Amino acid sequence: MKKISNKCLDLVKEFEGCRLTAYRDEVGVWTIGYGITNSDFKITKKIIRKGMKISKATAEKWLEESLNKKYLPLVLEYDKQYNWDQNELDALVSFCYNIGSIKQLTADGTRSKTVVASKILQYNKAGGKVYRGLTRRRKAERELFLAKAAPEKKPVKKKSNETIAKEVLAGKWGSGKERKKKLKAAGYNYAAIQKIVNKLCKK
């Protein structure tokens, strides 16, 4: 299951800002923390109203839960078409948190990633007016979207103790303390392997 990373959290925090006392936003909606509103009641379990205060830890907890439970699924709806890498996923969840959906951005999954990246910049208006903050945010999201994500590490399948014991006898792991150090560093049970080595030597 794909998840957001700290890159997404940091991006959202940077542009949303954090206010620990409830306030009304530009359109009169009660808001608190990193842009949390009463539409997030399933997460907060509280009604946001005048005079409400929360801690920074609560603000961060609510943000992370909102991103993972509410907005990540909206981005993953299109994962079959796009197979988002980590950076693309993080950028789009941030976008979705601000805009509410990526359906229009992706033309319901019909646009290429290249076109999606170019279209991100167009969402810098509110009420038909261009906002500098939204322009900066869209540029940051597009930059993250286009950044090459680190390749996913595939787990290395460990060899059996019997196979390693035979390699030890063949001299592949050195001898004495050096062998012990190498085996432990590779995550093998030195004592168990040595026991098998001793048995093989007696045959």
What residue spans do the PLM features occupy?
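Extracytoplasmic Gram-positive cell-surface binding/anchoring modules and repeats
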Residues: 161, 169-180, 188-190
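Repeat-associated, polar segments at repeat-unit boundaries in modular proteins
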Residues: 138, 142-152, 186-203
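Short, surface-exposed acidic-centric catalytic microdomains
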Residues: 30-47
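Short alpha-helical scaffolding segments that buttress acidic/His motifs in well-ordered protein cores
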Residues: 12, 91-96, 119-120, 168
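Residue-level detector of well-ordered alpha-helical segments, enriched
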Residues: 28, 88-91, 115-119, 192-193
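Long, amphipathic alpha-helical surface segments
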Residues: 1-21, 27, 36-39, 58-65, ...
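Alpha-helical segment that forms one wall of the substrate-binding/catalytic cleft
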Residues: 45-81, 86-103
